[in-house]
Regions:
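Hydrophobic alpha-helical transmembrane segments of multi-pass integral membrane proteins
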Residues: 1-225
Length: 225
């Protein structure tokens, strides 16, 4: 992200980054221990809850750090990608919380299914999906060795807004799955999310028209998208 924003953070100021990395990994270990052993000893759910809380908090802290860096950096065409990263970082705490809820011992099956679907929507479509799509905004033309097409940044920001809205609607619809119309709302949320993806796809196709991918890496990325 520093390269994208063209900023240089001195080594003496990297204490926060190191703390986040070590604490995040510790939280992941605690979370895994809780998930593995709480079935035999339900009281160990506290480890699952603590681990999920730490993971969510560290990633959110990373999002705040990125937000501060954006405010300090000069305007850049790569700024759109950082916006995607910030949005994704702020989604993970909610995904982690929903994941912790699904692991609660004795949770009723219907609630478990609803929380699980919401957890998957936030983490897969939100945290992972938004991060990957944001990377492609700038990485795709780089792989093709060409420039970003006109209006790509503006379109990508609107696509991000739609993707966030789609994730939010889908997750809330899953949580309140017993409410009449929730399934329709969840489908509508997915549709909105897909519209955001299609907007990014249009950017990718327009970029590809300036220079067609002739090597395996860009072809595989395009096929994967």
């Amino acid at each position: 992200t520093e390269a994208l924003m063209k900023i240089k953070i001195p080594d003496e100021a990297r204490g926060g980054q190191v703390t986040r990395i070590f604490t995040l990994n510790a939280g992941i270990v605690v979370l895994m221990l809780g998930m593995v052993f709480q079935e035999q000893l339900p009281t160990l759910y506290i480890l699952t809850l603590a681990g999920a809380s730490v993971v969510g908090a560290m990633v959110a802290w990373h999002g705040v750090a990125l937000l501060k860096q954006v405010k300090q950096a000069l305007p850049s065409r790569f700024g759109a990608t950082i916006r995607f990263y910030i949005a994704a970082a702020f989604m993970l705490p909610f995904g982690a919380a929903l994941g912790a809820m699904t692991a609660f011992p004795g949770l009723e099956k219907t609630l478990h299914a609803q929380f699980l679907l919401a957890h998957e929507a936030v983490n897969v479509l939100g945290f992972v999906g938004v991060t990957v799509v944001g990377t492609l905004i700038t990485f795709w033309p780089t792989m093709l060795r060409t420039k970003m097409v006109e209006n790509a940044l503006g379109i990508s920001v609107r696509a991000l807004q739609l993707m966030i809205a789609g994730v939010l609607v889908t997750a809330l619809s899953a949580i309140f799955g017993g409410v009449p119309g929730a399934r329709f709302a969840a489908g509508a949320g997915l549709l909105v999310y897909c519209v955001g993806l299609l907007m990014v796809a249009v950017i990718m196709v327009r970029t590809m028209r300036t220079k067609r991918p002739g090597e395996f890496p860009p072809m595989s990325v395009g096929a994967g998208f």
